[in-house]
Each structure stands twice: as C-alpha cells, then as structure tokens.
C-alpha cells in the first residue's frame, strides 16, 4: 500500500478507511485470517467475532504494531509496524466494521497509530 508518506494528521471518513482497509487486508492479512475473517482452525485466529477486534481499539493497535503469540493459535501474529499509519488505521477500521463485527469504537485514525508508535 506504499503510503508511508501519508499525512498521519489527515482525518479520514469511515468509508475511506474501510475502502483502503479492504485493500490492505487483501494484500497482507487474507492468507492467514482468510477472506471471510474466520482464520484457519488451530493455526490462525479468526477476526470475525474476535474479542480483540470488537474490544478496546488500543489493544488491537498494539497487536498490529507489536505482533502477538497466543497458545490457542500456533501461527503467531507478526508485527506490521512497517505499514504506514494510514494503512494500519484503515485495516483496523475495516476489520472492526466487517463480517459480524460491530465494534463500539469502530474507527481508527492514522494519528492514533502515530501516537501508539511513540509509546
């Protein structure tokens, strides 16, 4: 998605984020989490109905920036910190509004990713 030069202070609409997020998801996430968000049983975690995706967005941001190992899924989630702030915000927003997910905090802006990187 190349957009490391994106302005992290730009405020995106939810539709812009979801459109870009779908592209980011298809390029980087679909191999493990699948097009339907169901993951691969006993290998890669599902995102559809996930507590991480539907919970506190700060935790999901942290997972994308730092990766995560969980005993339930031996396929570890890698860190995606090489993606731009806009791409990470977009893919998180996409997952929080796709499949059966109805996250209360349903939008993430690039500035939130930028702030999380400095923690």
What residue ranges belong to the model's regions?
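Alpha-helix boundary/capping residues
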Residues: 24, 28, 67, 95-98, ...
């Amino acid at each position: 998605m190349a957009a490391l030069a994106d302005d992290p202070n730009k405020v995106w609409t939810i539709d812009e984020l979801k459109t870009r997020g779908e592209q980011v998801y298809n390029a980087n996430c679909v191999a493990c989490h699948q097009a339907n968000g169901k993951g691969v049983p006993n290998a890669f975690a599902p995102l559809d109905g996930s507590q991480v995706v539907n919970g506190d967005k700060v935790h999901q941001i942290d997972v994308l920036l730092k990766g995560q190992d969980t005993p339930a899924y031996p396929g570890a989630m890698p860190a995606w910190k090489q993606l731009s702030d806009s791409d990470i915000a977009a893919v998180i927003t996409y997952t929080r509004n796709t499949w059966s997910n109805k996250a209360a905090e349903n939008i993430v802006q690039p500035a939130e990713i930028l702030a999380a990187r400095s923690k």
